[in-house]
Amino acid sequence: MVIPPDRMFAAQWLYQLSIASSVMSIIAVPFSSSIIAHEKMDIYAYISIFDSVMKLLIVFLLAIAPFDKLIFYATLLFCIQILDFLFNQIYCHIKFPESHIIKVWDKDLLKSMGGFASWSLVGNFSYVFYSQGINLLINMFCGAAVNAARGIAVQVENAINQFTTNIQTAINPQIIKSYSQNNMHRMFTLIFASSKVCFYLMYLLTLPVMLEATFILGIWLGKYPDHTVNFLRLTLINTILSTLVNPMFTANLATGKVRIYHTLIGTLNVVCMPITYVVIRLTGIPETLFLLTVIMNMVGIFLRLFIMRKQIGMPITMWLHKVLLHIVLVVFSGAIIPFILYCMMDDTVSRFFAVCIACVICITLASYFLGLNGHERQMMTCKVIDIYHKKFRR
């Protein structure tokens, strides 16, 4: 990376504190997983809200910090990570007897867990290799300014992605429970339903941002690096596609047979890296990196479908019919009116609100009438009516 010599000390502090934060987050995984496995989503939500509020507080503290803001920022993030770990650990220690540390030696269990963790580590390394490799390639061929543009796009992606991640987290225990009970029909239903619902919600959030990216970035940052708008749009497309991957990833974890999954997906990530290098070297266009990532994710989705068919017997044609067909209908029908408004109106605040309102109305209606089957619409209607009576008819 290109780091100014006078900022090398701060960069080293940031690097060390980032490693320490990563270690704390890894140690906290068994406790947060226990909370999710017991479906204590209220506690999970409280901890998440605390985490978000504290990170927001950091932003205000940075404005008045009398010392190096980068080191101060990294230090506070590390402190928040410690608090998150303590909250998870203390709650699990009080509520769940199995979270207590006891001396046990089960060779078969250790072998199984070791294999699971090792192959998961391979998959995670391949993802880090590709994602960080993109940063290095952008830095090498396009410079730090273009890398900053990617950083902005990733910030927006993380903010939007957190919403559907929480929804998927709430569904994951049921997918795993269905597999453990050998109830494959219910498992397929949950995979299909969560894929569609998370996709529709993500589409509802991302379409206005993709259309009005220039306006939003102008209000948020004023001046921003070149390529930021294109990076943001392509990154959000990848984010939408990830909603189709997450349920299948959870289903794979439920089987415990992660070797084939991580080997194939990891190989795809690694193979794409030299291809990306050749393309950026020949074209010099940074957008091609993100376009290749979109293509890779599409290939990865269908690769995962073949893995699901082999591992849990999920028919690919059923996924195409019950998920992909509905999604395609929602994508095109939900975007027509917002896109027309975007093209016909001037770039003003009025257009921004008009496009946002049109996206909410059109995508909601398209998702309800075209994106759900009859049973899902009935369940959704009953749920909305139930919430209405609880909130407004007390």
Indicate residue ranges for each PLM-predicted region:
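Alpha-helical transmembrane segments of multi-pass membrane transport and lipid-handling proteins
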Residues: 1-2, 61, 164, 188-243, ...
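Membrane-proximal transmembrane or re-entrant/amphipathic helices at the cytosolic face
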Residues: 309-317, 338-394
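Helix-loop junctions and terminal segments of transmembrane helices
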Residues: 37, 96-97, 153, 157-195, ...
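Interhelical loop/hinge segments that connect adjacent transmembrane helices in multipass membrane
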Residues: 70-76, 86-132, 174, 181-189, ...
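Membrane-interface helix-loop junctions in multi-pass transport and translocation proteins
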Residues: 38-42, 53-86, 90, 94, ...
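Membrane-interface junctions at transmembrane-helix termini in multi-pass inner-membrane proteins
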Residues: 22-50, 71, 92, 236-268, ...
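Interfacial/gating helices of multi-pass transporter permease domains
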Residues: 70-75, 108-117, 136-158, 185-190, ...
